[in-house]
């Protein structure tokens, strides 16, 4: 699917056309390719258009609302497995991270793999993430970072969270924040591309 008609629908302030086009694309492509090959590049393109002054903030917000609705519907329509498979994944972002779409894309792909997902939405303090991981008996904590963050702050937050989590709880991190991929962080698994989630889930199942 080409991005131009979708970007035009955003610029024309036509949420119905955008929703219709996205819903059709999802049915035609299947959920995983829809997320990795359409939603992810479209989200990047919208962000770039906003930076370049071609989209207003309200247009970016409208896009986020529409795509959130489409992805939530897709996740809700997945048939639950008779016996839930691991891992159980707790999804969130840390404070100051307002971008929720990355999280939702990850949730859609993990749900498709049969994982049990618990999403706390955005901006959860480190201590609360650790508490929630215990309360929900999470096998994995998955965090999303956009490129708004200072690398030093990201590394410090991740070290703090890793120290508070049980050693048996995996910590997966991803998003467009380049600091996640520049050097290895002990006990933390970076997922640079959404396509890396499926092998990671398979690896987790193989070792548990």
Q: Could you say what each language-model-derived stretch is?
A:
Residues 1-79:
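Long amphipathic alpha-helical segments
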């Amino acid at each position: 699917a080409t991005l131009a008609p979708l970007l035009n629908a955003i610029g024309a302030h036509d949420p119905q056309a955008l929703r219709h086009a996205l819903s059709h694309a999802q049915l035609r492509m299947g959920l995983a390719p829809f997320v990795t090959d359409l939603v992810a590049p479209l989200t990047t393109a919208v962000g770039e258009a906003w930076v370049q002054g071609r989209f207003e903030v309200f247009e970016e917000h409208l896009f986020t609302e529409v795509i959130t609705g489409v992805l939530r519907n897709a996740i809700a329509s997945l048939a639950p497995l008779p016996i839930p498979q691991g891992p159980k994944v707790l999804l969130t972002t840390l404070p100051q991270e307002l971008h929720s779409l990355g999280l939702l894309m990850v949730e859609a792909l993990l749900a498709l793999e049969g994982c049990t997902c618990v999403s706390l939405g955005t901006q959860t303090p480190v201590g609360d993430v650790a508490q929630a991981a215990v309360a929900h008996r999470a096998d994995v904590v998955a965090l999303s970072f956009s490129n708004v963050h200072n690398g030093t702050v990201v590394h410090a937050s991740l070290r703090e969270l890793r120290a508070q989590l049980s050693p048996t709880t995996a910590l997966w991190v991803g998003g467009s924040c380049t600091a996640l991929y520049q050097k290895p962080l002990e006990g933390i698994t970076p997922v640079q591309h959404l396509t890396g989630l499926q092998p990671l889930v398979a690896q987790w199942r193989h070792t548990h």
